[in-house]
Amino acid sequence: MVRPRRAPHRSGAGGPLGGRGRPLRPFTARAARSRSWPASPRGPQPPRIRARSAPPMQGARVFGALGPIGPSSPGLALGGLAVGEHRLSNKLLAWSGVLEWQEKRRPYSDSTAKLKRALPCQAYVNQGENLETDQWPQKLIMQLIPQQLLTTLGPLFRNSQLAQFHFTNRDCDSLKGLCRVMGNGFAGCMLFPHISPCEVRVLMLLYSSKKKIFMGLIPYDQSGFVNAIRQVITTRKQAVGPGGVAGPVQIVNNKFLAWSGVMEWQEPRPEPHSRSKRWLPSHIYVNQGEILRTEQWPRKLYMQLIPQQLLTTLVPLFRNSRLVQFHFTKDLETLKSLCRIMDNGFAGCVHFSYKASCEVRVLMLLYSSEKKIFIGLIPHDQSNFVNGIRRVIANQQQVLQRNLEQEQQQRGMGG
């Protein structure tokens, strides 16, 4: 055993550590205020959450890989964060209040009904850290979210302040139920109300069933995290079927579901100048780790088929685009027809209604017959692309009008 250097108190058997290691120093509020800590290795952080830089929580390590948090996980691994065992004896109470959430009832009861739960809880931080909770509400409302939906938020999780949550054992059933649910792959999302004057807008709660601890993560990039978590919640609601029963998480070829809805278009018919309306349930996927804000997207997208040869002038704008993958389901005959048309030199132009409040105004849909996939291109320069595609459509309409006039003239001459 290494002998401690200049211990201020003798660490005998009756010491705070039972005769092993350096004893705990008695804490006073004055000492905590005057203590000077080195700068955080994470770099300067916004002062709205933490008044000064402080070292990361002891026993917390940041890894590069993402991993699930299951009942057998050795620590908290979401977002590459592994949290070791912590004791409350050397932590400062930062907040006290009530945490409320809704828990699904047992399978033998009504599946659509949820049971409201509430527990008194406290949030603790390390000595020397400052978490401004003066403006926090006395009741926090938590929403339970499957952890596998949060894999795209790894970078935002890594840049977070940690706080340990402790629940008072007044309601053992509620606490056991929360541990059971969160130990089986769920995380807690606490969205602070807009009427609250505090700077924190969202806080995530994770549970380690092995360490028996609850850890709160307060992202420094609150705005980015709020937008990302809203997209996750919206996607989750879209995946919930009738009766509130949620299906498995939609992941195709390591891509994450970003939007679900209906795609509608008009398809040329054999009769001259005749078209038939077609539609298909469609889904948009992005790479894991990417975020596509679709909460303001309409539920139905309207597509116009355009000959690809008319789009050659827009190639520079195509290069500066974001790629997403489209997936269509259900009507196999309609899907085959769409593949045949797009494989014969057509592209799809999806116009967003001006009533929609989203930033995207147009996206292009292309089909690869070799890979059997539909690729969507969302130009970053939306304004110039909209103007360019309008010119293309106007030129196409002029060409069609001239062709129609020529056909009529030929028929008249032949008669």
Swiss-Prot record:
InterPro entries: Med25_PTOV, Med25_PTOV_sf. GO terms for cellular component: nucleus; perinuclear region of cytoplasm; plasma membrane; transcription regulator complex. Transmembrane segments: none annotated. Ubiquitinated by the CRL2(KLHDC2) complex, which recognizes the diglycine (Gly-Gly) at the C-terminus, leading to its degradation. Ubiquitinated by the CRL2(APPBP2) complex, which recognizes the Arg-Xaa-Xaa-Gly sequence at the C-terminus, leading to its degradation. Residues 24-40 have a biased composition (Low complexity). It is found in: Cytoplasm; Nucleus; Cell membrane; Cytoplasm, Perinuclear region. GO terms for biological process: positive regulation of transcription by RNA polymerase II. Residues 1-54 are annotated as: Disordered. The modification Phosphoserine is found at S53. Residues 12-21 have a biased composition (Gly residues). PANTHER family: MEDIATOR OF RNA POLYMERASE II TRANSCRIPTION SUBUNIT 25, PROSTATE TUMOR-OVEREXPRESSED GENE 1 PROTEIN. May interact with CREBBP. Interacts with FLOT1. May activate transcription. Required for nuclear translocation of FLOT1. Promotes cell proliferation. This is Prostate tumor-overexpressed gene 1 protein homolog. It comes from Bos taurus (Bovine). The lineage of its organism: Eukaryota, Metazoa, Chordata, Craniata, Vertebrata. The gene is PTOV1.
